[in-house]
Regions:
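PP2C/PPM-type serine/threonine phosphatase catalytic domain
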Residues: 1-221
Length: 221
């Protein structure tokens, strides 16, 4: 809400996000130290305006954009396997299954943290998908693309997300699975779609009840 009351320039958005993430990072680090534990979490966030998408990422949760013709992975996994792939020591397929794909280069709550910011044009018609690594491990990009484009209604889109989470579970995925989706038919349809996005998140974010998340978050902040 504070961000929405400011001048929505790219610089202001990224400064505000960086401040927020740094504060959260320090609180998580302090919580872990005070309780004698190690913890860390990833974050991928997107802000949609009438003509732009603004993104920030720490870790390996992904953001995809379906632009009406193709599915684009907007974020890059911040993992040791991807680092090795970029150095030419692993192929893309090897990086996908390599055990180092689960080794994060950075996260919130542990070590050094430097968010990656970017922005891109928002297409007239399209969709955004945010997914944790538990979702992206089990589904191909072709399956994700179909999931975003085949449903014709909000209810069908929500059903596809629920089916995707169930499929990942049945395939043996034990990591956290969180999926959020937002689709729009034109740039004027953003407000109502945002409400549906929140509803989908509430249904699919993990296994614990929402009040349990609120309680644990309250212990930290």
């Amino acid at each position: 809400p504070e961000l929405m009351r400011t001048n929505l320039t790219e610089r202001n958005i990224f400064i505000s996000w960086h401040k927020m993430l740094e504060q959260l990072h320090q609180k998580l680090c302090s919580y872990a130290q005070n309780n004698g534990m190690q913890l860390g979490t990833t974050i991928s966030t997107v802000l949609l305006t009438q003509d732009r998408l603004y993104l920030v990422q720490v870790g390996d949760s992904r953001i995809y954009l379906e632009n009406g013709t193709a599915l684009l992975q907007l974020t890059k996994d911040q993992t040791l396997a991807v680092q090795e792939m970029e150095a030419g020591r692993l192929s893309p397929e090897e990086a996908r299954t390599d055990r180092r794909s689960s080794i994060l280069l950075q996260c919130l709550g542990y070590g050094q943290m430097e968010p990656v910011f970017q922005s891109t044009e928002r297409p007239q018609k399209g969709a955004v998908l945010l997914g944790s690594d538990g979702l992206c491990h089990e589904l191909t990009e072709a399956q994700l693309h179909w999931m975003l484009t085949e449903p014709k209604t909000r209810e069908q889109l929500q059903h596809q997300l629920q089916e995707a989470v169930s499929f990942c579970r049945s395939s043996g995925e034990t990591d956290n699975i969180t999926a959020l989706a937002l689709r729009w038919d034109d740039r004027e349809n953003l407000q109502s779609d945002s409400k549906e996005w929140i509803e989908v998140w509430a249904r699919l974010s993990g296994e614990a009840a929402p009040e349990e998340y609120d309680r644990k978050l309250g212990e930290i902040v």
